[in-house]
Each structure stands twice: as structure tokens, then as C-alpha cells.
Amino acid sequence: VKSTGRADDDLAVKTKYLPP
């Protein structure tokens, strides 16, 4: 997980790795 400093990116990454 890259630290972009944006919560939206972090959330997007989690939703990508985790099943819907």
C-alpha cells in the first residue's frame, strides 16, 4: 500500500483487495 496521503486512495486500495 503506497502512502499517498489521501484517505480516498487508501480506502480504494482496501476495497480492491477486500471482496465487496
UniProtKB/Swiss-Prot annotation:
One GO BP annotation of this record: killing of cells of another organism
Record's keyword terms, sorted: Antimicrobial, Fungicide
Coiled-coil segments: none
Basic and acidic residues compositional bias, start-end: 1-13
Superkingdom of this protein's organism: Eukaryota
Region listing for Disordered, in residue ranges: 1-20
Annotated function: Has antifungal activity against B.cinerea, M.arachidicola and P.piricola. Inhibits HIV-1 reverse transcriptase.
Protein name: Cicerarin
Naturally occurring in which organism (per UniProt): Cicer arietinum (Chickpea)
